[in-house]
Structure formats: structure tokens, C-alpha cells
Amino acid sequence: MFFGTFTPKLDDKGRLTLPAKFREELGEGLMVVKGQDRSLAVYPKAEFLVRAKKAAEASRTNPKARAFVRNLAASADEQNLDSQGRISVSVMHRDYAGLTKECVVIGNVDFIEIWDAESWADYSAEHEEDFSDGDDEVLATFL
């Protein structure tokens, strides 16, 4: 599982070092895809393949679901960590997420999110009240 917030830098070649504590959990291979709220989502490859297959099976008759699966599949980029624990973030993904040199990598329980640092700060500030107030339905699953 993935927890925590880290602030690695994107280098000039578009490489990003993932936190050491996430590397073992990612195992052999990972998938980088467009995420929600202009972030990137990083999944262990095996987990992503299970989720993608499930999503594809459910989407055959629903136009919105088909569009989601198409976008997900089209944005999927298979990666392997290099010897220094880095991934190469494609230009398409950097543009989508607005990534600059300053990035934020967060654990989101069963996957990782990569954000532009400024975008993450804006998102966090905008949603702080939502978190503080809590949602009874969401809290009930945690407490």
C-alpha cells in the first residue's frame, strides 16, 4: 500500500525519482496513466491490468464508460524503474498534468499520484474543508 507525501524534482530529461518506500511495492513494472484532477496515476502493472480488464468489460454498452476506458488505455505508459528508482515521464503526461520541475508524489492507498507542486497546493487548499468536515458515509468506512 502507498502512503505519504514526497517532493521529488523532475529532471531535464523528464525523469522522476519515486520514493524508496514505494519501489518495492511497485514490483516488476508499473503503468503511468492520466489520473483525476490533472494528476498522473501510477499502478503496479499487475494491478493495473486487472483493473483495466474489469473496466473494459463493464464499458461495452455505456458511452461514458467506453470513453473513459479509451482515454485510460490511450494514456497508459508501461515503465520500469531504472537503477536509481526513476521513471521517465512522457511529454504527453507532463503536459496533461502540467508538470514542472517541482513535483509532489503522494500515496493514495492502492496507487500513487504525481502532481505538479503548485497544482497540488491549490487542490489541497481547495479541499481542506471537505477533509476537515468529513463525509459521514466516507468516514464510516474508515472508522
Curated annotation (Swiss-Prot):
Organism: Corynebacterium jeikeium (strain K411)
The organism's place on the tree of life at top rank: Bacteria
Any one biological process term the GO annotation gives: negative regulation of DNA-templated transcription initiation
Cellular component aspect of the GO annotation: cytoplasm; nucleoid
Keyword Repeat recorded: yes
Protein name: Transcriptional regulator MraZ
Assembly and interaction partners: Forms oligomers.
Family affiliation: Belongs to the MraZ family.
Domain SpoVT-AbrB: 5-47, 76-119
Sample GO molecular function, one term: transcription cis-regulatory region binding
HAMAP family named in the record: MraZ
Keywords: Cytoplasm, DNA-binding, Repeat, Transcription, Transcription regulation
Subcellular location: Cytoplasm, Nucleoid
